[in-house]
From Swiss-Prot:
The lineage of its organism: Eukaryota, Metazoa, Spiralia, Lophotrochozoa, Mollusca. Transmembrane segments: none annotated. GO terms for cellular component: extracellular region. It is found in: Secreted. The cysteine framework is VIII (C-C-C-C-C-C-C-C-C-C). GO terms for molecular function: ion channel regulator activity; toxin activity. Keywords: Disulfide bond, Ion channel impairing toxin, Neurotoxin, Secreted, Toxin. This is Turripeptide OL71. Expressed by the venom duct. Contains 5 disulfide bonds. Acts as a neurotoxin by inhibiting an ion channel. Its main location: secreted.
Amino acid sequence: ASCAARACALSGSNITVTYCSCTDGTTHVCPDGDSHETNDMYFCENISGVAACPDTNTVAVEVIYRDDSTNPIEGFQLHCRCSTYESSGLHYVCEELIG
């Protein structure tokens, strides 16, 4: 299987690590940290969407929606990655996008 389509992106940084199982967007395949440790969260990144973002500090990622701690994945939503993420209700969002 190719790793070209997706990779795991570490929030709060420009680090992107290859993670082949990100090709399955229906399951929780990226590693993650504690729900309160949002700076350590990993997100499944759509590499093809990176070029649509204005610069290297805003990378397109699919935000992982969480319904609860035992069944964390409710869906994905594409955003441009900013500098930091934080918890907002049932999902993680870029701090700069909270308004």
